[in-house]
């Protein structure tokens, strides 16, 4: 494999100005999204105080567990559950 000499990159004033404008735009979007999240959390906490939970009564964690198929409740360790229904 042939090795190339490194290419020289020059940073121009226009490039830095463009970077700053894009950075400010992204920060403003993030700030707006955070404000919406804070307002959403406030309204959902008000709803949970009044209604006793979210709209379907499930927490975020429960919704995630349901989506991925995780069953956090252990099975009871009783004899029929351990050995099945054995009849002699």
Swiss-Prot record:
GO terms under biological process: anaphase-promoting complex-dependent catabolic process; cell division; mitotic cell cycle; protein branched polyubiquitination; protein K11-linked ubiquitination; protein K48-linked ubiquitination; regulation of mitotic cell cycle
Stretches with biased composition (Polar residues): 78-88
Domain of life of the source: Eukaryota
Disordered: annotated span: 17-36, 69-88
Keywords assigned by UniProt, alphabetized: Cell cycle, Cell division, Coiled coil, Mitosis, Nucleus, Ubl conjugation pathway
One CC-aspect GO term: anaphase-promoting complex
Subcellular location: Nucleus
InterPro entries, per database record: APC_suCDC26 (IPR018860)
Pfam families found in the cross-reference section: ANAPC_CDC26
Pathway listed: Protein modification; protein ubiquitination
Coiled-coil portions: 7-37
Record's subunit section: The APC/C is composed of at least 12 subunits.
Annotated family: Belongs to the CDC26 family.
Role description: Component of the anaphase promoting complex/cyclosome (APC/C), a cell cycle-regulated E3 ubiquitin ligase that controls progression through mitosis and the G1 phase of the cell cycle. The APC/C complex acts by mediating ubiquitination and subsequent degradation of target proteins: it mainly mediates the formation of 'Lys-11'-linked polyubiquitin chains and, to a lower extent, the formation of 'Lys-48'- and 'Lys-63'-linked polyubiquitin chains. The APC/C complex catalyzes assembly of branched 'Lys-11'-/'Lys-48'-linked branched ubiquitin chains on target proteins.
Protein name per Swiss-Prot or TrEMBL: Anaphase-promoting complex subunit CDC26
Organism whose genome encodes this protein: Danio rerio
